[in-house]
Amino acid sequence: MTLAARLKQEFVSGWKPFEVVWLALFIIAQIWAYVQTPDSWLAMISGISGILCVVLVSKGKISNYFFGLIFAYTYFYVAWGSNFLGEMNTVLYVYLPSQFIGYFMWKANMQNSDGGESVIAKALTVKGWMTLIVVTTVGTLLFVQALQAAGGSSTGLDGLTTIITVAAQILMILRYREQWLLWIGLNILSIFLWAETPAIYLMYSAYLLNSLYGYYNWTKLVKRTN
C-alpha cells in the first residue's frame, strides 16, 4: 500500500460525519480561546494537538501517537511555566516514552474496521480492577508526599492527576477499554487544575466529552474483538 493510500485510510476512511464536525468544533474552540486570551501560543498548540490525539485514540487510530508526541513536548513547557511539577514529570517519564512504546504495541494488534484500521481492544477482569485500584491508591499517597517535599503547586490535585494519568496511559498502551473511565475522572480533575489557563481548560473540557465517546466506541471494539 502506498503512503498516500495509507494516509487516506487513516484520516479519511471510517469517519462518521458527526465525528468530523465534533473534531472541527473542538479545534475552532481552541483557536477562539487563544484569540480571546492570548496567554500562550504553546498552550494553543498543545491544546489542538492534544485534541487530535485523543479523538484518534477514541477511534482506535494508531496515528494518535504522532499528535501525542507534539502534545507531550508543548505541554511540558506549559506545565513548567505553571510550576506543576507532577505534570512535568508525567510528560517526561510517561507521555514521551509511551508514544514510542504504544505505537509498536498497537502496530502489532490492528484490525480492519469500517473501511480503515482500528486497534484490537480488551476489557479488564475483576483481578485486573483490584490491582488497578490498589496500585493507584498507594501510588497517589506516595507521590503527593514527594511533591510536597519538592515544593510543587497544588500537590494534592497534581499528584492525583499524575498517578491517574500513568495508570490510564498504561491501560491505553495495553489496549484496555477501562482507560476511558480513568480519563473521565482525570479530565474532571484537570479542569479544576487548569482553571486559570483558558486554552488548557478548554482542552480538558473537550477531552471529557471525548472520553465519554471513547468509552462507548471502545466498548463496541471489545465486542467486535470477542
Curated annotation (Swiss-Prot):
Residues 1-14, 58-65, 111-123, 175-179, 224-226 are cytoplasmic. Induction: Repressed by NadR. It is a multi-pass membrane protein. Keywords: Cell inner membrane, Cell membrane, Membrane, NAD, Transmembrane, Transmembrane helix, Transport. Residues 36, 87-90, 145-153, 201-202 are periplasmic. GO terms for molecular function: nicotinamide riboside transmembrane transporter activity. The chain crosses the membrane at residues 15-35, 37-57, 66-86, 91-110, 124-144, 154-174, 180-200, 203-223. It holds the Pfam family NMN_transporter. One of its GO terms (cellular component) is plasma membrane. It is found in: Cell inner membrane. The keyword Transmembrane applies. It comes from the Bacteria. Beta-nicotinamide D-riboside binds at residues 183, 187. PANTHER family: NICOTINAMIDE RIBOSIDE TRANSPORTER PNUC (PTHR36122:SF2). Belongs to the nicotinamide ribonucleoside (NR) uptake permease (TC 4.B.1) family. Required for nicotinamide riboside transport across the inner membrane. This is Nicotinamide riboside transporter PnuC. It comes from Haemophilus influenzae (strain ATCC 51907 / DSM 11121 / KW20 / Rd).
